[in-house]
Amino acid sequence: MGTSFGRGGATTFQQDLQYSDCILIMGSNMAENHPVGFQWVMEARERGAQVIHVDPRFTRTSATATKWVGIRAGSDIAFLGGIVNYILEHERWFDEYVKRYTNAPVVINEKYEDTEVLDGFFSGWDPDEGRYGEYDITTWAYKGTKAQTAPNSKASLTRGEQSGHGGHGGGLSHGEPPEEDKTLQHPRCVFQILKRHFARYTPELVAEACGCTPEEFVAVAEALCANSGRERTSSIVYAVGWTQHTVGVQIIRTAAIIQLLLGNVGRPGGGVMALRGHASIQGSTDLATLFNILPGYLSMPQSYSEGGLEHYIESAKSPGGWWGNADAFIVSLLKAWWGAAATKENDFCFDYLPKIDEDHSEYWTFVQMLDSKVKGYIAVGENPAVGSANSKAHRLGLAKLDWLVVRDLVEIESASYWYDSPEIESGELRTEEIPTEVFFLPASSHVEKDGTFTNTQRLVQWHHKAVEPKGDCRSDLWFYYHLGLKIRERLKDSRDPKDRPVLDLTWHYPTQGEHDDPSAEAVLAEMNGWDEKGGALSDYKPLKADGSTASGCWLYAGVYADGVNQSARRKPRWEQDYVAAEWAWAWPMNRRILYNRASADPDGRPWSERKRYVWWDGEQKQWTGKDVPDFDLQKPPDYDPPDDAKGPDAIRGDHPFIMQADGQGWLYVPQGLLDGPLPTHYEPHESPFKNPLYSQNANPRRQQFHRPEDPANSPEGYPYVVTTYRLTEHHTAGGMSRTVPYLSELQPAMFCEVHPDLARERGLAHGGWATIRTARAAIEARVLVTDRIKPIRSNGRVVHQVGLPYHWGSRGLTKGGSANDLAHMTLDPNVHIQEVKALTCDIRPGRHAR
């Protein structure tokens, strides 16, 4: 979504779903995995909305929907691409919205060639470039422009932050867009390229690729079209069922294209609702737990890039849009971290930041571990021995470390692999031969510490400590703060320049209690930041690049406005409207719907009274409405920037997407993605089917490691499709739930879902045992024979699907095989996410012979 709209966060909030006229849920079992938010889907259904669930499995979400369509795991782009084609073929797009608010009229340069011409490749493909083959993205550019932020002419491995939870499409050179055709007839304008690209995604091809019927597909496409436009809006909801593919980012891109064509972005009851994988996954990415970003989705400096802060700013800034203020964002971050030590003379300590070269993702780190190139590892809030694809390879990697620190609530599999794991049981690993020194440090749960969750709708909510942690349990904040103090104490007499980044850090947070717990509120206040007088910032607009302001995360500026913890606000719903602006705080600037300038027409009037949300008040000369306007408050709809305008001032008054360089929603992405400017259907890395569109079967840019510990399935030996999923009763890798008696009683055993026809074909008995195999591993599971997971008919044959929850491991009150043992380490190239929603397997009756 970042490359499509300008920010990677959900465009809307869950309460707004109640005002949708149609809700399409794909890649999510929302009723079971996000049950609190699902109440608003049920509210919409009671108001007459159509609720459609498209998924390989029939779940509780399907049961409460008005329509369920079963599809093959891994065929999402084929289905969504069919909707794009349906919109274009039947002329159902929102014409004024598309022409005025998107890059549909923009003309693309002559070098661009489509996958329809190059049989599954975009122009610029070089199979010998880089580790996996790379695209020369300059061939995708707007006519007369060049990429602004790309570090070189190729698509760099580390640029995927543009497509993540908060990334953006990057800058464009001055003068954009250089050429437009508002009639949308130019053969190289984005609109015509889009039509040609998706022309083959007919209902018949969708049915062939996905395993549904043409009639089922048309019913979904028509429902979205009929419930979009001036008077009506539709929403699309997804979760990790879309992200965990080698084309995960491009699946989400296809949904963004649909919503832009239908005019649903920035409007009440519309948008794209990204349901995150746990309570604060949005917050963890906002604050940069990913290797390639800094807080607020600023890019990490590159090791091969020279020129210091000036060159970094030059590559990060966009001539138009709010990323034109990237210099203020990065300098304010540096001031928050290094305070008085950060001066203009020393580039505000920019050189203190680590520089990255290529890939430092979790999977590449473990590949290096397997080669004994990693000496130590700290695992916090992570259980790679169960939760990562090809968990066996991860356990083998851990066994080659010199030391390992695991911080968790209980002793999870990543802490016990050296004496209790499938490899210990089989003899592949021997405890006495493992050199790793393992430290297990008990952590505090969220009820034992103050802090925040930033949830699926960018809502930062404060949680208060309810009880003191027991024994040696400590919060992660306590751990890192006191670890920092000890390191600084060790280095206090150092004169080595490499130690200055640690010694110069602002590390003076107030502490409290017998264990000297640092104040979480003080950290939140630092994220918010201060102005030149030391006053708390009210938002990010006052940030400056001269060193007079500080902010630990520019997106969070305003969360501590007026020196008050805004995330702790709890005004009851009956005392405010449904937007609930005084319940907690949402980034940025407490906006609940992003791009809400698009809820008004180009002249600033609501598209309809029924969908009135934000509009231009001609008398007051400002934008107003039910939410914080996502636009410059005093910029009129007819504002036309002068030629020398920069940053936000370069965005027209009728261009709502203020984080994009041109202020437009991007149907076509000229830069920011590694695998193509448009989504296209590729088969999963492992698939029993041939690509119905191209001879190129899988995403050519997918990230592969070609390791002996990660062999690929042969097509003939593994005839079935596996998809993994979550249960309501267990949480992620199971460390927090398999140790809880009543949750373990509710879901007491690892199981596999199979259709009755597959059970007969393989001799599987309901309640009996089955062994599921891939080339990586084999696990055993109890058999659940059910009609809920349908076989797929494609290419004239039937292929069965097997459903596996992934919560089990060797520890806890309930133990079982880990579904991730079966998976391969093949990743989406943009965000390095594993493909565990679609792979192949074999299944046989009986227990796994060890």
Where are these regions (language model features)?
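Short beta-alpha connecting loops at secondary-structure transitions
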Residues: 63-71, 417, 425-426, 442, ...
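Extended redox/cofactor-interaction regions of prokaryotic respiratory oxidoreductases
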Residues: 1-36, 40, 47-49, 153, ...
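Long, contiguous, secondary-structure-rich segments that constitute the structural scaffold
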Residues: 478-533, 624-627, 632-634, 639-650, ...
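Glycine/threonine-rich phosphate-binding loop and adjacent beta-strand/alpha-helix elements that clamp
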Residues: 436-469, 480, 668, 785, ...
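A glycine-rich phosphate-binding loop feature that marks nucleotide/adenosyl-phosphate handling sites
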Residues: 100-103, 223-224, 239-241, 271-282, ...
